[in-house]
UniProtKB/Swiss-Prot annotation:
Keyword set includes Glycoprotein: no
Pfam family, one: Ribosomal_L35p
The protein's name in its UniProt record: Large ribosomal subunit protein bL35
Organism: Leptospira borgpetersenii serovar Hardjo-bovis (strain JB197)
A GO CC annotation given for this chain: cytosolic large ribosomal subunit
Highest taxon in the source lineage: Bacteria
SUPFAM superfamilies: L35p-like (SSF143034)
Record-stated family: Belongs to the bacterial ribosomal protein bL35 family.
Amino acid sequence: MPKLKTNRAAAKRFKFTKNNKIKRKSMNTRHILTKKGPKRRRRLRGLTLVNNSDWKSIVRLMPYGVR
């Protein structure tokens, strides 16, 4: 059986944690930040976890990311 290819777009956007949860960057942080308050911008700064319902589809894109 041939090697599976990793989707490069997904590999750049997602990282796996030690417990196989998936981290992603928060959305709404690219532009038009002037109308967003400082508290909201601070909250959006960090990484968040991907929802469990999306986990399976992301794992299919990154077959070697899961431990």
